[in-house]
Amino acid sequence: MLNLTINGKNIQVEEGTTILQAAKDNGIYIPTLCYDEAVKVYGACGLCVVEAEGIPKLLRSCSAKCSDGMVINTESDRVVQSRKIAMELLMSAHNGDCVAPCQLNCPARTDCQGYVGLIANGEYESALKLVKNKVSLPASIGRVCPHPCESACRRKNVEEPINIAQLKAFAADLDLNGEKYIPEKAEATGKKIAVIGGGPAGLTAAYQLAIKGHDVTIYDMMEKMGGMLRYGIPQYRLPKEVLDSEIEIIEKLSVKMINNVKLGKDFTIASLKEQNDAVIVAVGAWKSSSMRTPGEELDGVYGGIDFLRSVIQGNPVDIGEKVAVCGGGNTAMDACRTAVRLGAKEV
């Protein structure tokens, strides 16, 4: 066994033990970035350096072996200064690509921490511009998004997650109630693009493509644009006046919108391709999910999405006084609340 001293503590280790391992085994912390027990020692980060009496150079503790009688200091001024310089060098070449968990959890990869910070500083217009880099309908989406960003928010480890989705809607509402932000368009490319479907995906595609200078036309089978935002989400959750205002902004980017036309009946992908340089299919998912159980075809049994769409379009739906809802997701809860609003006494 070898006898040595680390930070005034006398310890014994087996021959061949590194200084880093000896320190770790005895509860002495030495920082390191590149060390991993599962791989060959690299020693590149320079953070694990220590000072040994009688040795002029600092030693990389991840690779330097212990020797008998060694006296080691892991916290001297010289060691601390060396580690500071090593970290500064590492960070000087860092591309700043560390992404916050809220952004990683967002399907659109919205810069959540960025716009939350701007809102906190009162920079509402800058916050909106940052949001609209990814989300073209922030006032609408901010109201109905299931906000997976908040489930990843690290603030919940202290108290509660930041209300990220509502902050997005807040910045967008300020814009809609004032002088609306219309992004600057790039020079016209001469390219024509057809978008099939005027829901959130189609509208977002049209918004982004128009900004890039393309000539965009949206084709939709319904009377108005909006897709499931309009026909699948009740008014109490998403006021259609808000959705209309956001769609108007997209129209002001010279996006043409054609309603009451259906793929396969009024046009085909091939016919659109003849007139355009590209075709984007964004038709959405309009069918209710089947439970694959007997009795689904009986009178008085409705799919959740079909039920909500009928109510939103003003079509009469006879639900009686007692309603059973199978499911517990967003559509199911919307169906529950809508049934109560239609007069159901028990849901």
Q: Which sequence ranges carry the predicted segments?
A:
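Conserved beta-strand segments of alpha/beta enzyme cores
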Residues: 71, 215, 254-256, 300, ...
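N-terminal Rossmann-like dinucleotide/flavin-binding domain of flavoprotein oxidoreductases
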Residues: 128-134, 167, 229-277
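A short, gly/pro- and small-residue-rich
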Residues: 293-309
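Ferredoxin-type iron-sulfur electron-transfer modules and their immediate structural context
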Residues: 1-192, 240, 279-298, 344
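Residues in the short beta-alpha loop(s) of Rossmann-like NAD(P)-binding domains
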Residues: 222
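Rossmann-like dinucleotide/flavin-binding elements
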Residues: 196-219, 258-268, 273, 287-289, ...
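Redox-cofactor binding/interface segments in oxidoreductases and associated redox assembly factors
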Residues: 281-282, 303, 325
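Short alpha-helix immediately C-terminal to the canonical SAM-binding loop
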Residues: 226
